[in-house]
Amino acid sequence: MGDKPLRVLACGDVEGRINALFNRVNAIQKKSGQFDLLLCVGDFFGSSPEAEAEWATYKSGAKKAPIHTCILGAASQETVKYFPSSDGCELAENITCLGRRGIFTGASGLQIAYVSGREAHQEPAPSHCFTPKDITALVAPLLSNSKFRGVDILLTSQWPRGVCQYGNSPETDMKFCGVSSIADLADKLKPRYHFAGLEGVHYERLPYRNHVVLQENTQHVSRFIALATVNNPAKKKYLYAFNIIPMKNMDSTELVKQPQDVTENPYRKLMKDGKKERQSASMTDAQEEPASQFFFDLGQKNPQRQHGRKRQSDGDRPNQHKQPRRPPQPTGPCWFCLASPEVEKHLVISIGTHCYMALAKGGLTPDHVLLLPIGHYQSVVDLASEVVEEMEKYKSAFKKFCKSKGKRCVLFERNYRSQHLQLQAVPVPMEKCSTEDIKEAFMTQAEEQQMELMEIPAHTDLKQIAPPGTPYFYVELDTGDKLFYRIKKNFPLQFGREVLASEAVMNIPMRSDWRECKISREEEEDQAKQVRSDYEPFDFALDD
């Protein structure tokens, strides 16, 4: 077929509503023209007498599918009877069962990998389940080919575990949905499209990349799409139409184009975490010092909230069974560990469970703040997952605060000659400059100092670019755009401040050095009190 795109329809669980499905397909084709293929995931057959009678009309030839239809094998014991073979076969005219697992390659070169059924939890495996051997038999021949780049389409009955990581959230909480074996399969096969069913949910995840930025060659992106059940009462989407040119027929430059909303691969972290969990399963005594002991009188109107979080007795503490990873301990006095006597507590604005916000000492502006972990972590890439999650909440809340004041938030971190993470959050008045002006100022001044400041995709996980221990400087703009520089030597410690204080941004060059901006303790207390009051409507920690 050359470079002519194939027109494909994908469908969720049919559950025996075959007439309803094909009536819908006929209507689509009447309106939009003929499609080449229909792919069905989840349970195709139903177990009711009505469903059996409906199928009989297609099996006998009294009715015919209006399009070449490929379905997965059984995903429940009740429907095994409809499949004469686990190896795949034609069940009726225009309806083909692909089988338990394998690769289907069409005349056009379109490559479809598939795994039918649910993950087996017993031996011998029931006929509607797949085993680790099935996964190995599918993956091994493909990965042994040095020219393997991925498959065009992956069809699975079950969801991959952790697919929502880094992505948009589905309509219902699917955090513990799916299985790790399918996640591992998707990570290895790198499908351009991955369809799954069984959950009765429609979810189109943001596309994710299959390479590590700045460390691996650019590869094509993957899209995961879960589809609902045919004719579901909530009218959730169960059919998905798309055009696809087989990978083997595509120009490599076109194939690896990255959409703007691409995210990190959701499965790499899952695999790493899985290994860590297995390695540390016996470590039950490591427990992070609870943040509930850190309560200061921050001059709030309601003294019982004590900065805003309820005091929790040992018996009242939620998630008491959780034992988060203990952060590294400082080797000496630390000015930023919240439990440390060195902390200037009058500067604290808000305290969460794992992070806190404090007024910057000698700030660029009166509302310049620091976002910091309560425990001793050196950089963003060192943070435990629960700390990262709360740090993101603080970033989001402070951005909303800035927007309400007619300002845009610029975040930057210098992981160089510092022992405790300080994420600088600086509000820049919108009338002063645009986001593009700020970006250009950073790029220009970096170039002047012979530093290669690189723009990286908005959803990039810094851990993949800068492993723990790597000195770096990074900026995050209000649009989500990020700039990154791997520090080599002689990095100017005030670089972030100098750029924001420059004529091109806020035009306050005299404030580029924090030591020149120090004020009395009394003035600091007044500033902190004002920021605390202004920020209060956005402080999620007050509700915890």
Curated annotation (Swiss-Prot):
InterPro entries: Cwf19-like, Cwf19-like_C_dom-1, Cwf19-like_C_dom-2, HIT-like_sf, Metallo-depent_PP-like
Coiled-coil features, chain-numbered ranges: none
Gene Ontology BP term (one): mRNA splicing, via spliceosome
CC per GO annotation: post-mRNA release spliceosomal complex
Region Disordered: start-end pairs: 255-331, 521-544
Domain of life: Eukaryota
Listed GO MF terms: RNA lariat debranching enzyme activator activity
Disrupted gene: phenotype observed: Morpholino knockdown of the protein causes reduced swim speed and abnormal touch-evoked escape response. Morphants exhibit abnormal cerebellar structure.
Biased composition regions of type Basic and acidic residues, renumbered to the chain: 266-279, 521-535
Listed PANTHER family: CWF19, CELL CYCLE CONTROL PROTEIN, CWF19-LIKE PROTEIN 1
Family: Belongs to the CWF19 family.
Protein name according to UniProt: CWF19-like protein 1
Source species of the chain: Danio rerio (Zebrafish)
Gene from which this protein is expressed: cwf19l1
